[in-house]
C-alpha cells in the first residue's frame, strides 16, 4: 500500500499534493468499506494504546502550540479549546475504547420485508466513502473524527487549524501506528501536512470527486465559508446559541445548578449556554439567586434595565447579544412572558443546536421538547450534555444542526448511508 505524504515544510505544489492525498484516501476507503469488524477493532485497540503510551509526546507538542497562541493574544476560551491535559488525553483514549466496543454499523440490516411476488428487500448500512473534516483549534477532533471514520468504514481527510498543527500531528502519529498494526492503509486517516489555508478551498472542491462529504468544526466564519464554497454535501455544525429557560415550575436549587453548569463548566464548548431566560412568574423569587450564582462564579451577565434593577452588577445588553455565541464566561439574560415568551425568543435567536428547560411541570416540559426546533432539547439537564460521548457514541465528529441525513451528535452510525439488497428467485416484472 502507498503511504500518504508526511508533514511538508517549505514550498509545495499544493493542488498536486491535495489531489494525491484525495486519491489515496479514495483507495483506502475501498479497503475500509469491506474491512471486517475484527480488523478495524484491532486498529482501534492499537490506537488507544498508542495514545496512552505517547501522552507525554502529545502534551509536549500541545505545549508548543499553546505557547505560540498565548503569545498572539488569543482569548481564554480559544486557549482552553486548544489545550490538552493528561485528563483530556485519557478521555481521548477512553473514547477510542468506547468506539471499539460499540456495534459496527457497516452491514447492519435496518429493515427487511418481503414483497407479494416473493422478493425479499433489505435496507443495509454502508459507509459514505471519504469524509473531509475541517476544524479549528480542537486537536482532539483528530482522534474523534479519525476513529469514528474507521469504525464506520470511511476514510477521513483531516485539515486541522494551523494553531493546533503540532498537536494534531502528534495524535495522528498514534492513529497511523494503529492502522499499521492492523495492516490497514495509512491513508485511511490522512492529516493534511501543510498549514496553508488554500488546502481548505481545495478540499471544498471535492478533489476531483475524491471527497464525498465535508464536516466543518469551527466558528461561524469557517462554517459560512464551507457552506458557501463546498461542491460536496456538508454536515453543518453551526454555532451554539443555546438557551436555558427557567420555568415557573422549576425547583430553584436545581435551576441554579443547571444554569451554572450549562454556562461555566466549560464556557468555550459548543454546548455552553449563552442565554438565560426566566419566566416572569418565577422572576420575583428566582431571578436574583440565579444572577448571583452566575456573577459570583466569575460570569459576566448582560441584561436590560429590569435585570439591572434586580442586580446592579448586571451589564447592559445589546441586540446582538441575543444571537452571540460568546465562548467566554458571559451570558445574556432576559425575563420572558412564560413558556410562550421563551419559545418565541428561541425561535428568533436560537441556532437550532441545544435548548433546555428547567421545570417540574411535565406538561410545560413536553410542550417545550415538542415545539423547540433544535437538534438537542433537554428537560432538567445541562446543555453541556450536548456531546457524542455523553450520548454513548464514544465520540462525535460534530453536532449537526441541519435537518438532512444527520442531526445532533454525529457518531459512527450517522457516518453511514444505506443501500437496498434485493433477493429474488427468478422473478421478472410483468
From Swiss-Prot:
Gene Ontology cellular component terms for the protein in this record: cytoplasm
Functional pathway: Amino-acid biosynthesis; L-proline biosynthesis; L-glutamate 5-semialdehyde from L-glutamate: step 2/2
CDD domains: ALDH_F18-19_ProA-GPR (cd07079)
Catalytic activity, reaction form: L-glutamate 5-semialdehyde + phosphate + NADP(+) = L-glutamyl 5-phosphate + NADPH + H(+)
GO-annotated biological processes: L-proline biosynthetic process
Enzyme class label: oxidoreductase
Main subcellular localisation: cytoplasm
Gene Ontology terms, MF aspect: glutamate-5-semialdehyde dehydrogenase activity; NADP binding
Highest taxon of source: Bacteria
Keyword Transmembrane: no
Keywords: Amino-acid biosynthesis, Cytoplasm, NADP, Oxidoreductase, Proline biosynthesis
Compartments in which it is found: Cytoplasm
E.C. number(s) listed in UniProt: 1.2.1.41
Keyword Cytoplasm tagged: yes
HAMAP family recorded: ProA
Family: Belongs to the gamma-glutamyl phosphate reductase family.
Function: Catalyzes the NADPH-dependent reduction of L-glutamate 5-phosphate into L-glutamate 5-semialdehyde and phosphate. The product spontaneously undergoes cyclization to form 1-pyrroline-5-carboxylate.
Listed name of the protein: Gamma-glutamyl phosphate reductase
Amino acid at each position: 500500500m502507498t503511504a500518504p505524504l508526511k508533514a511538508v515544510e517549505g514550498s509545495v505544489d499544493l493542488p498536486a499534493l491535495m489531489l494525491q492525498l484525495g486519491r489515496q484516501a479514495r483507495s483506502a476507503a475501498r479497503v475500509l468499506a469491506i474491512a471486517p469488524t475484527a480488523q478495524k477493532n484491532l486498529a482501534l485497540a492499537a490506537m488507544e494504546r498508542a495514545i496512552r503510551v505517547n501522552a507525554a509526546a502529545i502534551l509536549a507538542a500541545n505545549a508548543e502550540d499553546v505557547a505560540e497562541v498565548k503569545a498572539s493574544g488569543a482569548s481564554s476560551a480559544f486557549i482552553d479549546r486548544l489545550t490538552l491535559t493528561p485528563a483530556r488525553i485519557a478521555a481521548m483514549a477512553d473514547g477510542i475504547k468506547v468506539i471499539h466496543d460499540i456495534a459496527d454499523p457497516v452491514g447492519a440490516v435496518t429493515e427487511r420485508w418481503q414483497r407479494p411476488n416473493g422478493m425479499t428487500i433489505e435496507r443495509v448500512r454502508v459507509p459514505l466513502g471519504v469524509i473531509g473534516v475541517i476544524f479549528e483549534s480542537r486537536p482532539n477532533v483528530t482522534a474523534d473524527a479519525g476513529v469514528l471514520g474507521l469504525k464506520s468504514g470511511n476514510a477521513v481527510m483531516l485539515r486541522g487549524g494551523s494553531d493546533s498543527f503540532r498537536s494534531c500531528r502528534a495524535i495522528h502519529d498514534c492513529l497511523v501506528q494503529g492502522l499499521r498494526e492492523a495492516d490497514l492503509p495509512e491513508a485511511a486517516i490522512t492529516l493534511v501536512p501543510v498549514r496553508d489555508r488554500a488546502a481548505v478551498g481545495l478540499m471544498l472542491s471535492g478533489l476531483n470527486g475524491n471527497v464525498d462529504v465535508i464536516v466543518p468544526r469551527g466558528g461561524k466564519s469557517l462554517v459560512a465559508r464551507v457552506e458557501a464554497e463546498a461542491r460536496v454535501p456538508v454536515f453543518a455544525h453551526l454555532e451554539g446559541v443555546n438557551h436555558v429557560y427557567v420555568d415557573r415550575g422549576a425547583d430553584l436549587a436545581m435551576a441554579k445548578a443547571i444554569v451554572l453548569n450549562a454556562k461555566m463548566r466549560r464556557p468555550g464548548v459548543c454546548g455552553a449556554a449563552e442565554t438565560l431566560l426566566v419566566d416572569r412568574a418565577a422572576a420575583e423569587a428566582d431571578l436574583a439567586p440565579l444572577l448571583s450564582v452566575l456573577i459570583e462564579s466569575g460570569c459576566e451577565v448582560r441584561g436590560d434595565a429590569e435585570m439591572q434593577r434586580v442586580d446592579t452588577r448586571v451589564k447592559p445588553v445589546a441586540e446582538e447579544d441575543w444571537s452571540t455565541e460568546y465562548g467566554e464566561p458571559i451570558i445574556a439574560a432576559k425575563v420572558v412572558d412564560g413558556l410562550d415568551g421563551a419559545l418565541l425568543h428561541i425561535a428568533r435567536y436560537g441556532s437550532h443546536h441545544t435548548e433546555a428547560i428547567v421545570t417540574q411541570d411535565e406538561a410545560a416540559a413536553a410542550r417545550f421538547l415538542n415545539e423547540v426546533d433544535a437538534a438537542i432539547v433537554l428537560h432538567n439537564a445541562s446543555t453541556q450534555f450536548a456531546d457524542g460521548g455523553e450520548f454513548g457514541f464514544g465520540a462525535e465528529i460534530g453536532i449537526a444542526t441541519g435537518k438532512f441525513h444527520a442531526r445532533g451528535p454525529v457518531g459512527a452510525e450517522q457516518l453511514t448511508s444505506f443501500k437496498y439488497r434485493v433477493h429474488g428467485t427468478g422473478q421478472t416484472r410483468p
